[in-house]
Swiss-Prot record:
InterPro entries to which the protein is assigned, alphabetical: QueC (IPR018317), Rossmann-like_a/b/a_fold (IPR014729)
Protein name per UniProt: 7-cyano-7-deazaguanine synthase
NCBIfam families: 7-cyano-7-deazaguanine synthase QueC (TIGR00364)
Quaternary structure and interacting proteins, as annotated: Homodimer.
Enzyme class: ligase
PANTHER family: 7-CYANO-7-DEAZAGUANINE SYNTHASE
Cofactor binding notes: Binds 1 zinc ion per subunit.
Pfam families for the chain: QueC
GO molecular function, one term: zinc ion binding
Family: Belongs to the QueC family.
Positions contributing to Zn(2+) binding: 187, 196, 199, 202
Name of the gene this protein is made from: queC
Amino acid sequence: MKQEKAIVVFSGGQDSTTCLFWAKERFAEIEAVTFNYGQRHRLEIECAEQIAEELGIKHHILDMTLLNQLAPNALTRQDIKVEDGQNGELPSTFVPGRNLLFLSFAGVLASQIGAKHIVTGVCETDFSGYPDCRDVFIKSLNVTLNLSMDNSFVIDTPLMWLNKAQTWELADQFGALEFVRERTLTCYNGVIADGCGECPACKLRKKGLDEYLSYRKEF
């Protein structure tokens, strides 16, 4: 029987929407939190709002625009080109401190609404080199949050060891593959659904979908 409550860190993208469906299957009550950190595309927040409303999930939007002032990057500035990391450098889309701050504020919100679980869609398999998507970081932060608030939060990372094809498969298991494909925004250029097809996020998303659909046809 479902008994516990969870808060889902929710961007309106493929991964966090899949996590939303994952959480709906596991917890008696869930709420979602989206962070406005000055993203290039306001549409990202609107997507999150629409999905949460359609699924009947209480949705919080927190102002984190200070992050844009501290750490300019390709996700928040039109004049910074979206580029993969070269020669060991981080991609231009990396936002220093983003997951640290988002999960910390999600922890504060969780303590206020009585949620034990904090769900996030970070993934080490297809993590694009972001250090704050690693399992070791999440485990460390989980300990820190509990010590800082004298609580017993559990940070759940259902996608941590899944590649993009497996993430599509997980959405399909919940009967949500088409929902995730048509309603979510992953594209760095702000194009909903299958996206622009050119940016790194769209290429990774399409590659995973093609792999999964090819695999599914065989069975």
